[in-house]
Amino acid sequence: MSALTRCLNEEAAAIAAAATRLEASQVDAALDLLDRCADQRAKLVITGVGKSGIVARKIAATFSSIGLMALYLNPLDALHGDLGVVAPEDVALL
């Protein structure tokens, strides 16, 4: 089996395992928050440090590309004045 095939099989298994851990109510709640962002023109503020920060930037860019106002907020910078971009109606993904 090639390395690519092994990698794809491992990724597929991880996705299948995640699907069994998610409850419909959790998915519905997350989708409701995203709907709220779209309906109220609220921002989706995504944060993370290190590897999770890299993923957070990608998630923010992906949501922005489909028309949802989303941004990456460095949590260290947030502590030093950047929280001004966050409004009460915004949704945070930590």
Show the residue positions of the predicted features.
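Conserved N-terminal alpha-helical segment that immediately precedes and caps sugar-phosphate-binding
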Residues: M1-L94
